[in-house]
């Protein structure tokens, strides 16, 4: 709830607590978890808390930098599904930064491919994955989907 205080979103303790409770439930956590210490949470739960901390401020745009890279495959899937659900519910736009093309394919509509800090390709997910134009994009796709 610190973000609520800093950004003065709610002066009322009752509204403050209601907003916290709503976002905790939205990200798939239990209300009794609010009294736990940080070391008592799993990696997936910590990621859900990070998402809740961002969303409680009611942004239109959320920048996610490698949000699933430290998570195992099962938890990655859960977090991606959660992000898609929250995107729809809260009408969010994401800038999703990742090296994992399988995750990018699952969550993105538009994709920007960068090499050495320079944009080499920007197109729809369909075009990037089905007919990439830049050789670097082609190389990335080939190496990512060899399995």
What is each of the regions a protein language model found here?
Residues 56-60:
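A short, proline-enriched helix->beta-strand linker immediately N-terminal to the Walker B motif
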Residues 2-5, 14-32, 141-142:
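Conserved ABC ATPase "signature" region
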Residues 104-106:
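A short, surface-exposed alpha-helical micro-motif characterized by mixed small hydrophobic
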Residues 37-41, 45:
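Conserved ABC ATPase signature
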Residues 51, 79:
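Hydrophobic anchor residue at the start of the ABC signature
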Residues 110, 122:
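Short, glycine/charged-rich "phosphate-handling" switch motifs in NTP-dependent
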